[in-house]
Each structure stands twice: as C-alpha cells, then as structure tokens.
C-alpha cells in the first residue's frame, strides 16, 4: 500500500514542474496582453507625433511670410538680407525660412497667382494700366514719326495761299539756273503787265489760286525784264565792228 501511494505522487510531481504557466488565471493573461498592446501603440504613435510637430510653425510667423510672398509673388526668391530681416521678424532660423519658401513656392504661390487672375477688380485694374501704358507709348511714338526730319518732309506739307511778298521771297527763281524760264518770260506780251496794275484795285474779284498763279507770273516777267536790260547793256558795251 505504501508503494502504491508513493507511485501517484511521483507521477504528478514532474507535470507540476514542467508546466507552471498552465496554473495561471485567465485574468492575468489578458492584463499582460493589454500592456503589450499599449506599449506597441505608444511606439507607433511617437513618429506621427514628431512628424506633426516638425512642420508646425507659429501662426504669426506664417502670416508674415505669406504677406511677404504675396508682395513679391512674381519673384518669390528672398535674398540673404531679406531672409535675415524675416528671421528677425518671425523669430525663425534661416534654415526654417528657406525650407518654408521652398514648399510655399510649390503649394501656396500657384494659388495666389490664380486667385489674382480670377479677381475681377484686380483684372480690371490690370487691363486699365495696360491700356494706359499702350496709349502713352503710342503718343510718344507719334511725334517722332510725324515730325519733319529733312527738306523732303517739309515739301510734303500742304500748301496754303501766302501773301504776295512772302511768295516772292520763296519762289524767286535764280536768273542763272533757269534760262528757259527767262526766254518764256521775254516772249510773253507786255499787256498782261497792265492787268497786274488793275488787280490790286479789285482784290475781291480774284480768287486765292488765281492770285498765287498771277504772282508767280509777275516774278517771271520781272526776271525777264531784268535779263533783257542786262542783254542791252552787254550789247552797248561790245565794240561796233
């Protein structure tokens, strides 16, 4: 009987030594698993938290940077002096400002430009400015083209009837350069000279065009008479054969 009692005791002792974990309660197992899950959740949440903190800048600093970019939206590349000035205003480092502008030129700047184009008030002002500059450029170019640059341009101007004395100064022919005109003037009858004497008495009967043509004819007659007098003097000075 003692041997039989010792036998079962010996068979139970190795089982108890080999499997101590099986004797734990289910409540302890669930608590251990919940702790492990909480630890893994914290480990996974740390990188996301750090990532969010990395890109967040103060709202006042971002507003200053956005205002500067809007003013210089057509050339949003600040120089070193401008970066230093923005750094003092925003209390940010030069590296942070440089990185913000790199990202803003890709994400914020296109929206700014598109918003300016879609704004009807700004677009209307831009159209008015362009029209005004176009008018100024055309007004500046017209005097340069219309101004006389030489004697050819002066001759192309419209002619108006001028007083008799002024026409005589402008249209007086050179006696040496126009011999054919002298000969035609000599061949004209002298009766028309008498008509010129009567013309001043009745200026209202003579049109401006006829008056202009008649004055030029008188100049030719005067030149012809002067030339005839010179020829007579030359004949008198020549010795008789």
UniProtKB/Swiss-Prot annotation:
This is Homeobox protein TGIF2LX. It is found in: Nucleus. GO terms for molecular function: DNA-binding transcription factor activity, RNA polymerase II-specific; DNA-binding transcription repressor activity, RNA polymerase II-specific; sequence-specific double-stranded DNA binding. May have a transcription role in testis. GO terms for biological process: negative regulation of transcription by RNA polymerase II. Specifically expressed in adult testis. Keywords: DNA-binding, Homeobox, Nucleus, Transcription, Transcription regulation. Residues 195-206 have a biased composition (Low complexity). Its main location: nucleus. One of its GO terms (cellular component) is chromatin. It comes from the Eukaryota. InterPro entries: HD (IPR001356), Homeodomain-like_sf (IPR009057), KN_HD (IPR008422), TALE_homeobox (IPR050224). Residues 1-58, 126-210 are annotated as: Disordered. Pfam families: Homeobox_KN (PF05920). Residues 21-39 have a biased composition (Polar residues). The lineage of its organism: Eukaryota, Metazoa, Chordata, Craniata, Vertebrata. SUPFAM superfamilies: Homeodomain-like (SSF46689). Belongs to the TALE/TGIF homeobox family. CDD domains: homeodomain. SMART domains: HOX. Residues 48-111 bind DNA.
């Amino acid at each position: 009987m003692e041997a039989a009692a010792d036998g079962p005791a010996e068979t139970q002792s190795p089982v108890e030594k080999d499997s101590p974990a099986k004797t734990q309660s289910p409540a302890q197992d669930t608590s251990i698993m919940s702790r492990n899950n909480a630890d893994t959740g914290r480990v996974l949440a740390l990188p996301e938290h750090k990532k969010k903190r990395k890109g967040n800048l103060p709202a006042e600093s971002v507003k200053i940077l956005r205002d500067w970019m809007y003013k210089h939206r057509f050339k949003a590349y600040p120089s070193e002096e401008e970066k230093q000035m923005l750094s003092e205003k925003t209390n940010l480092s030069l590296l942070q400002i440089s990185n913000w502008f790199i990202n803003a030129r890709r994400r914020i700047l296109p929206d700014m430009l598109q918003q300016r184009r879609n704004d009807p008030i700004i677009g209307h002002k831009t159209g008015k400015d362009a029209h005004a500059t176009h008018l100024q450029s055309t007004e500046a170019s017209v005097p340069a083209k219309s101004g006389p640059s030489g004697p050819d341009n002066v001759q192309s101007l419209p002619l108006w009837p001028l007083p008799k004395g002024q026409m005589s100064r402008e249209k007086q022919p050179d006696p040496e350069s126009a011999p054919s005109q002298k000969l035609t003037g000599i061949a004209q009858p002298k009766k028309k000279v008498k008509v010129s004497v009567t013309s001043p008495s009745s200026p209202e009967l003579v049109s401006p065009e006829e008056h202009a043509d008649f004055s030029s004819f008188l100049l030719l007659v005067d030149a012809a008479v002067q030339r005839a007098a010179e020829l007579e003097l030359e004949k008198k000075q020549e010795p008789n054969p």
